[in-house]
Amino acid sequence: MCIRDRFCSVRKLDVLQELLEDSGITEIMVNGWQHIFVEKNGRIFPWEKHFTSPEKLDDVIQQIAGRCNRVINTLHPIVDARLDNGSRVNAVIAPAALDGPVLTIRQFPEEPVTMERLLAYGSVTEETLRLLIPLVRAKYTILIGGGTGAGKTTMLNALSAFIPEDERIITIEDNAELQIQGIPNLVRLECRAANIEASQEITMADLLKTALRMRPDRIIVGEVRSDAEELLQAVNVGAEGSMSTIHANSCRDMITRLETLVLMGINLPLPAIRRQIAAGFDIFVHLGRLRDKSRRLLEICEIDGIVEDEVVLNPLFLYEEECGLVQKGKLKHRSKLERAGITLEDGL
């Protein structure tokens, strides 16, 4: 073992340190001590190196958990954490993991991906940016949906670059990973999991209630989960221009997911939930991964009110296999644009 390997084994994260120092790697997947996979440039492949023993992988997992004041053991075999560089970590051990400890690390770029880079990658088009950028500036409330690894957080970071710098922004996340830049009046809040005595938890609901008392111009929530009813309350009581992400398979599915998440926390009639969704959100953006593993903006829809207790969507752009992103309609609700003194280009 060379001096560097010995140092990484003792002071760093052992064999994973080399991967963590590669800015091109977006995901590190450890399936037991002998099998490591990485994602780079949208493709997943096995790595030739592995841990020297099961105990060494256990040590690394305990080291990560300890740095974040988290506990992982047979009674609490699952932990979410964050590395010093901001990477998001999920670890699972026995008895939940049947074939050895599982460690997954999501890495984020040192510098946030800009909208210019997304345009160069082909993830977005100039036509969609001519719509989305004015909507962000005019404080349209936007929800970004997609599957795991679709680029939701990347899109949220890129859109946030167009928020006027004189606004007060509050961000709320389970694990801090947003890279909001150019906003001097920025407050970052992070949830905290309960300790082993099931106390001292700080939930998304706690932080959303707190954020509303902090005079926000906008609230940016990293991901909507079980406390969705609190986010609906926030966007319905004046936090216009707020943005968030959600796991969903289409713009229509984003409505169903919101309904389900709200019902997990509070028993409300579906028509009441749908009215809150229609009143609180203005725009849905859906992202996905194509068969070639590339990430693409697939759909943009405008929330067009309620008809017979159903949320009505006005499709603005839709991805088609042969044509790419195709404009399907024009924005109907323009009052926020008018108040902001912003005019969309002709045809949008």
Locations of the language-model features?
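NTP-binding/hydrolysis catalytic cores, primarily Walker-type P-loop NTPases
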Residues: 4, 292-348
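N-terminal anchoring/assembly modules that precede and organize ATP-driven motor systems
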Residues: 4-45
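P-loop NTP-binding catalytic core
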Residues: 22, 35-138
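Flexible beta-alpha connector loops of hexameric P-loop NTPases
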Residues: 48-52, 116-124, 185-202, 218-221, ...
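P-loop NTPase switch/communication element
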Residues: 109-120, 157, 161-209, 254-258
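Hydrophobic anchor at the beta1->P-loop junction of P-loop NTPases
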Residues: 144
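Conserved lysine of the Walker
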Residues: 152
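Conserved P-loop NTPase nucleotide-binding/switch module
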Residues: 173, 180-181, 211-305
